[in-house]
């Protein structure tokens, strides 16, 4: 079995048996995929351990693509392994980060993964903790109602968007299968879908790349998160947030 859910942001209540009773029939061979903003690797130190150990003891394997709210510095410290034909960061034996541009074969179906998204909750800026005016600017923003800001390498990471190498690897892997997959799992949506939503959404290099994938690839379903809603955009494109759906 393969299930997919949306943004978690470090809140894993939905995986408790009373909310997800299907897990009673699952084993570690079954997979739950989070479509980004996993948030379980946030502090990058022992403060994450209790949560990650709890996730490891769930009856299924938990895998996630990255979102725009992840501690990329911490994720990149985990060793890279091969899993079902693609690269992962092995956070725990059964808690896995599905790296960008990969194709995984799960129960004889191909899954293409391309995590990441551009943050839109940074209208008040990204603060540099080493800047001489950091404390002053932080205090001012903390006093401002509904301030939307982030702190570099503490609550925001430039790696939220893919690197040139990750785009190149995605193209190589798609070329190898003739751009034919069964499922696509991303955090943000292709440009044409992203612009249908909030006025805060805008095109960027990643959404434009995903638009190219939408136009070139052959696939059955595309599942994504990021926009905090549960909604079928059309018969092929599914936006997920709290909902858990079985795809295989």
Regions picked out by a protein language model, each given a short descriptive name:
Residues 1-4, 8-14, 131-134, 147:
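Acidic, histidine-bearing metal-coordination/catalytic regions of metal-dependent phosphoesterases
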Residues 8-9, 38-39, 68-71, 117-118, ...:
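Catalytic metal-binding/acid-base residues of hydrolase active sites
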């Amino acid at each position: 079995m393969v299930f997919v859910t949306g943004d978690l942001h470090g809140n894993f209540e939905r995986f408790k048996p009373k909310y997800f009773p299907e897990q009673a029939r699952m084993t570690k061979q079954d997979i739950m995929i989070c479509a980004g903003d996993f948030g379980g690797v946030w502090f990058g130190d022992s403060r994450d351990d209790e949560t990650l150990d709890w996730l490891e003891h769930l009856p299924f394997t938990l895998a996630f693509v990255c979102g725009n709210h992840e501690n990329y510095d911490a994720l990149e410290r985990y060793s890279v392994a091969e899993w079902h034909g693609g690269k992962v960061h092995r956070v725990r034996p059964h808690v896995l980060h599905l790296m960008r541009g990969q194709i995984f074969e799960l129960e004889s179906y191909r899954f293409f993964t391309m995590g990441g998204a551009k943050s839109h909750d940074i209208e008040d800026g990204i603060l540099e903790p080493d800047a001489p005016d950091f404390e002053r600017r932080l205090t001012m923003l903390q006093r401002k109602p509904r301030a939307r800001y982030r702190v570099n390498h503490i609550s925001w990471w430039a790696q939220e968007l893919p690197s040139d190498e990750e785009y190149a690897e995605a193209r190589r892997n798609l070329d190898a299968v003739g751009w034919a997959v069964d499922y696509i799992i991303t955090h943000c949506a292709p440009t044409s879908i992203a612009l249908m939503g909030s006025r805060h959404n805008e095109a960027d290099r990643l959404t434009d790349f995903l638009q190219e994938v939408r136009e070139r690839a052959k696939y059955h379903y595309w599942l994504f998160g990021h926009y905090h809603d549960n909604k079928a955009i059309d018969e092929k494109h599914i936006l997920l947030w709290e909902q858990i759906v079985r795809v295989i």
